[in-house]
Amino acid sequence: MRIGILTSGGDCPGINATIRGVCKTAINHYGMEVIGIHSGFQGLLTKDIESFTDKSLSGLLNQGGTMLGTSREKPFKKGGVVSDVDKPALILQNIQEMGLDCVVCIGGNGTQKTAAKFAAMGVNIVSVPKTIDNDIWGTDISFGFDSAVSIATDAIDRLHSTASSHKRVMVIEVMGHKAGWIALYSGMAGGGDVILVPEIPYNIKNIGNTILERLKKGKPYSIVVVAEGILTDGRKRAAEYIAQEIEYETGIETRETVLGYIQRGGSPTPFDRNLSTRMGGHATELIANGQFGRMIALKGDDISSIPLEEVAGKLKLVTEDHDLVIQGRRMGICFG
């Protein structure tokens, strides 16, 4: 069997470990041939490929990014690397001409939607969920999330010392456009006093009162963790806006920090390395068993899979009854 593998959308720690898990299992256990497709779906349009061997996969486990490269090419939308052609039809033709029996797609929500469409067209597809945002429906955790939370938590830890030294409020902005999982998990792990996520409405006066109450209790500094997506009207960056409003409400010197793309870079955590390896191996097992049109998922501590059509177009969001939100409120943390 000849399988292709691609990575699409934004990069994150753990992609290379997943590629390694898929390919080493395919080559060493099942005797399959594996073809790497460069730059996501763009590579399927241009036939930009390479053959993998066991040797070529050495050293991948701890590397960030993706050895295959990635792009945001959308095969079902106009534009991109090729124009004035039926891109889905061209991809189907190229898959046949390259002799691919199956394609493994590693990506986020957009990739899952695209994979579901190709599966509906008869392409043998298996997908692996990848995002630092942890917002892919159907899996408890996506690889990349733990690494991003670790990076954000380390930054929050460092801000505690400078905030306490200057008796300031420090606002740190983390990634999460529609889902606040990174803000929630890093905010709780880093001892944030205020945690703002897109899913829970906030009130600046409530936030200001929380900070002033801390001051009355002899706590002269505060840490505020915000997800980038809490602002919906495009006024400013979330951290900048919240910092200005807090300083206006409280009169306390407030500074902001935006972590940005640093959350996507660097080596994956041990948890993500193991999760990626397991997910990659399970993807190859599905292929060997002829189970296509499915996305790998983590349920509890078990790796399973679910139909792609159940995943496409859905988001996994933070809810107010999530255990961490409930526990945070019990401890006096303000969620807005």
UniProtKB/Swiss-Prot annotation:
Q: Which family does it belong to?
A: Belongs to the phosphofructokinase type A (PFKA) family. Mixed-substrate PFK group III subfamily.
- Name of the molecule in the record: ATP-dependent 6-phosphofructokinase 3
The top EC class, named as a word, is transferase
Q: Which domain of life is it from?
A: Bacteria
Q: Which cofactor does it need?
A: Mg(2+)
Site annotation (Important for substrate specificity): which residues? G110
Organism field: Bacteroides thetaiotaomicron (strain ATCC 29148 / DSM 2079 / JCM 5827 / CCUG 10774 / NCTC 10582 / VPI-5482 / E50)
Instruction: Quote the EC number.
Output: 2.7.1.11
> Which compartments is it annotated to reside in?
Cytoplasm
What exactly does this protein do?
Catalyzes the phosphorylation of D-fructose 6-phosphate to fructose 1,6-bisphosphate by ATP, the first committing step of glycolysis.
Q: Which InterPro entries match?
A: ATP_PFK (IPR022953), ATP_PFK_prok-type (IPR012003), Phosphofructokinase_dom (IPR000023), Phosphofructokinase_III (IPR012829), PKF_sf (IPR035966)
Give the quaternary structure. Homodimer or homotetramer.
- One Pfam match, given by its short name, reads PFK
Say where the protein is mainly found.
Answer: cytoplasm
Q: Which gene encodes it?
A: pfkA3
Annotated Gene Ontology cellular component terms: 6-phosphofructokinase complex
Q: In which pathway does it act?
A: Carbohydrate degradation; glycolysis; D-glyceraldehyde 3-phosphate and glycerone phosphate from D-glucose: step 3/4
Arranged from A to Z, the UniProt key words for this protein are: ATP-binding, Cytoplasm, Glycolysis, Kinase, Magnesium, Metal-binding, Nucleotide-binding, Transferase
